[in-house]
């Protein structure tokens, strides 16, 4: 063979080996690769949605609309309405509102007809913190107090009747702008802290202010009567020669009971026999007496 042809053949082989070759994939390999890609995308989407839900719960932005068909949604709307009516009452807005006005101000106009009917016929009507006035709804506090004078009268009535004080939280719930009113009353009221750290307001009766000896105060506080009832305390005082105010006071005279008159006895009536022979019979008693 011609040597020039051999050289050209070798060069052709070298060029063929240096050029890259792309092969076609089979159908089975293509389907497997596509399914694996789909699985990866699904996992990524699921993970992202789960992370979004977890982030929503962690941030506290829980949507009530997700529970629109459950009882939790209904009671959540009810709690929001009651809290809103309470806050507006404390601001001084005491005029009643219709249900549509309440739903508008609480941003719940998109609730269903069933939930709206439930609020109108059951939930708001039977709620102890809501009162119905001419088809409208208003907040109903524990005490009807509108100003500081009414608060002072209420505390005075509790003091005179021996009912004690009133919780500060009940006054804050009932009286609009309660902090200003309490501050304005000054020394006319007293504050007492309970063991559970709740504050109680009392009427400060200045006519009852007098000095008591410290020794007497110590003796008074040292006496424990927690485990004794009223009967045991009364028996102990009697043994010590101390009588109660009930015994020393005027005794009530028992009313005189009038005797009932005995009922008059009715004459007995005897049944007479042979009444049909009254005109035929004769009396022979005179003849027998003469013999």
Curated annotation (Swiss-Prot):
Pfam families: TFA2_Winged_2, TFIIE_beta. GO terms for molecular function: DNA binding; RNA binding; RNA polymerase II general transcription initiation factor activity. Keywords: Acetylation, Disease variant, DNA-binding, Nucleus, Phosphoprotein, Transcription, Transcription regulation. Residues 66-146 bind DNA. It is found in: Nucleus. Tetramer of two alpha and two beta chains. Interacts with FACT subunit SUPT16H. Interacts with ATF7IP. Interacts with SND1. Part of TBP-based Pol II pre-initiation complex (PIC), in which Pol II core assembles with general transcription factors and other specific initiation factors including GTF2E1, GTF2E2, GTF2F1, GTF2F2, TCEA1, ERCC2, ERCC3, GTF2H2, GTF2H3, GTF2H4, GTF2H5, GTF2A1, GTF2A2, GTF2B and TBP; this large multi-subunit PIC complex mediates DNA unwinding and targets Pol II core to the transcription start site where the first phosphodiester bond forms. The lineage of its organism: Eukaryota, Metazoa, Chordata, Craniata, Vertebrata. The gene is GTF2E2. This is Transcription initiation factor IIE subunit beta. SUPFAM superfamilies: Winged helix' DNA-binding domain. PROSITE patterns: TFIIE_BETA_C (PS51351). Residues 257-271 have a biased composition (Basic residues).
């Amino acid at each position: 063979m011609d040597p020039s042809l051999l050289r050209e053949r070798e060069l052709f082989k070298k060029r063929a080996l240096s050029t890259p070759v792309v092969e076609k994939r089979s159908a089975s390999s293509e389907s497997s690769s596509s399914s694996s890609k789909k699985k990866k995308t699904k996992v990524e989407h699921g993970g992202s949605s789960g992370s979004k839900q977890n982030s929503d719960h962690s941030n506290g932005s829980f949507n009530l609309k997700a529970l629109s068909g459950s009882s939790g949604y209904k009671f959540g709307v009810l709690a929001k309405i009651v809290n809103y009516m309470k806050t507006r009452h404390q601001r001084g807005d005491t005029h009643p509102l219709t249900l549509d006005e309440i739903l508008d101000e609480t941003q719940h106009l998109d609730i269903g007809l069933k939930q709206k009917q439930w609020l109108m016929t059951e939930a708001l009507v039977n709620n102890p913190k809501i009162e119905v006035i001419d088809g409208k709804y208003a907040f109903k506090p524990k005490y009807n107090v509108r100003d500081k004078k009414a608060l002072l009268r209420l505390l005075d009535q509790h003091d005179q009747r021996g009912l004690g004080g009133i919780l500060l939280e009940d006054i804050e719930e009932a009286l609009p702008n309660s902090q200003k009113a309490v501050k304005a009353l000054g020394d006319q009221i007293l504050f007492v802290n309970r063991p559970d750290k709740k504050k109680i307001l009392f009427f400060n009766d200045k006519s009852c202010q007098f000095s008591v000896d410290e020794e007497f105060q110590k003796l008074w506080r040292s006496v424990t009567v927690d485990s004794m009832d009223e009967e045991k305390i009364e028996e102990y005082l009697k043994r010590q020669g101390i009588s109660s105010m009930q015994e020393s006071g005027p005794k009530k005279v028992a009313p005189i009971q009038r005797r009932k008159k005995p009922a008059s006895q009715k004459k007995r009536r005897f049944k007479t026999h042979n009444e049909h022979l009254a005109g035929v019979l004769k009396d022979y008693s005179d003849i027998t007496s003469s013999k």
